[in-house]
């Protein structure tokens, strides 16, 4: 409510400027986000931008697209070239955000210039320099999505431990259903991270070794698990030559029984589908049951760039940032709209488990691409050993000093 009142007051203060801008054609603000494609908040995002345009007389040139490696790479290239947008919805407090920090404005600096705004400085998003740059919008978790109705139809056990996972893979493979939808060539990080969950204890998941000799044995075993799953027929035959959209379509069309993915995948499900979907913790490779940790965090938020801050578009950009991050709009953009069995299983996934950050978030872009796009596919195919994988990764000093 406080933010909503401030936004109304701030907009009122700028009405004369907006009116003048409208008369002169207004200013044009460039925005980039991943509110596009099947994202459930895509429509709400467009509505927010349209409302801002109608109220301000300004124009928003939005370049949103589905979040993938190509999307991230394009954004980082824009920042490197000095052609970044005015407002950006992007990853925060991880390796992805480090390259953009010199060209975005801290929330403390914005709040100092606009004291009534009081953008929330969430400690979870505090960067290594001690500053917070992003207004948080979306938290996330990752898990093993399953079509429970397919499990019932084919008499396959839900993966409550490693043996039941392997049995489910066998049953679905024999019945012409892809057991686990994945793209090894495009987005293999869910598989890599979940393999670590299957093998590593909490302290090992949080380890940041400096040399290959310090790499936990469980990390090596996790890579072996990827090869084990491949040999068991867990993935489609073309998993190494397909993209994320194609592999996800297999799951959405129920041609695949399971998919390792994040909470954002739920935006592609209808309420009816959520009644027969569940998200489960990763089974342990050794021992009983499932992992006592899950992957999660606050993943993304809105940034204001210095390009906008140091231009005549500053007030207009701050007003748009305020509108995008109002309490009401954060709910609209951050709401995953979970219902039914999927909702209850997501709550169970997190209850009583420790949240850990994905390992890739601690790596820089070069190391992450080496691990995920070079090593993981090769390990799955059997052309690289787990030892060779981690030697290659550790040679790049993945976690810094």
Give residue ranges: language-model regions:
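Conserved N-terminal structural module of periplasmic/extracytoplasmic solute-binding proteins
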Residues: 8-9, 18-96, 286-289, 388, ...
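Extracytoplasmic/periplasmic substrate-recognition and gating elements
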Residues: 30-33, 50, 54-55, 59-62, ...
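C-terminal capping/gating helix-and-loop segments adjacent to ligand/active sites or protein-protein/ligand interfaces
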Residues: 127, 296, 334-401
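A structural signal for short loop-to-beta-strand junctions that line the ligand-binding cleft
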Residues: 77-78, 86, 114-149, 178-182, ...
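Short, solvent-exposed loop/beta-turn-alpha elements that line the ligand-binding surface or hinge
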Residues: 108-120, 200-223, 271-272, 284-293
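Extracytoplasmic/periplasmic solute-binding protein
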Residues: 133-135, 142, 166-212, 227
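Glycine-centered hinge/linker elements that transmit conformational signals in sensory
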Residues: 169-171, 209-240
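Hinge/lid segment of periplasmic solute-binding proteins
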Residues: 90-143, 157, 166, 191-193, ...
């Amino acid at each position: 409510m406080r933010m909503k009142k401030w936004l109304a007051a701030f907009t009122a203060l700028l009405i004369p400027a907006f009116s003048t801008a409208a008369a002169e054609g207004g200013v044009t603000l460039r925005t980039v986000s991943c509110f596009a494609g099947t994202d459930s908040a895509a429509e709400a995002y467009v509505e927010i931008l349209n409302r801002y345009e109608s109220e301000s007389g300004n124009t928003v040139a939005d370049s949103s697209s589905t979040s993938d490696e190509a999307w991230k790479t394009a954004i980082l290239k824009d920042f490197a070239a000095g052609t970044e947008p005015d407002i950006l919805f992007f990853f925060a407090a991880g390796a992805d955000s480090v390259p953009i920090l010199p060209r975005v404005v801290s929330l403390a600096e914005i709040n100092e210039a606009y004291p009534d705004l009081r953008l929330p400085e969430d400690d979870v998003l505090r960067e290594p320099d001690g500053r917070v740059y992003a207004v948080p919008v979306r938290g996330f978790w990752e898990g093993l999505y399953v079509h429970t109705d397919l499990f019932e139809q084919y008499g396959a056990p839900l993966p409550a431990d490693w043996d039941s996972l392997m049995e489910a893979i066998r049953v679905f493979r024999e019945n012409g259903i892809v057991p686990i939808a994945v793209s090894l060539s495009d987005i293999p990080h869910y598989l890599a991270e979940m393999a670590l969950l299957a093998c590593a204890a909490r302290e090992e998941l949080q380890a940041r070794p400096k040399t290959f000799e310090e790499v936990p044995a469980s990390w090596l075993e996790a890579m072996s698990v990827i090869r084990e799953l491949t040999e068991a027929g867990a993935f489609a035959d073309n998993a190494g030559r397909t993209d994320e959209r194609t592999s996800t379509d297999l799951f959405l069309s129920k041609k695949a029984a399971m998919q390792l993915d994040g909470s954002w995948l739920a935006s592609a499900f209808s309420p009816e589908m959520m009644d027969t979907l569940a998200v489960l913790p990763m089974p342990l490779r050794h021992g009983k049951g499932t992992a006592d940790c899950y992957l999660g965090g606050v993943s993304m938020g809105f940034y204001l760039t210095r390009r906008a801050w140091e231009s005549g578009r500053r007030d207009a950009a701050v007003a748009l940032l305020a509108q995008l991050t109002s309490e009401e709009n954060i709910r609209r953009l951050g709401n995953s709209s979970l219902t039914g069995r999927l909702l209850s299983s997501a709550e169970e996934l997190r209850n009583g488990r420790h949240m850990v950050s994905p390992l890739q978030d601690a790596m820089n872009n070069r190391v992450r691409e080496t691990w995920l796009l070079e090593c993981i596919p090769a390990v799955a195919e059997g052309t690289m050993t787990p030892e060779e994988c981690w030697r290659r990764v550790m040679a790049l000093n993945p976690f810094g000093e």
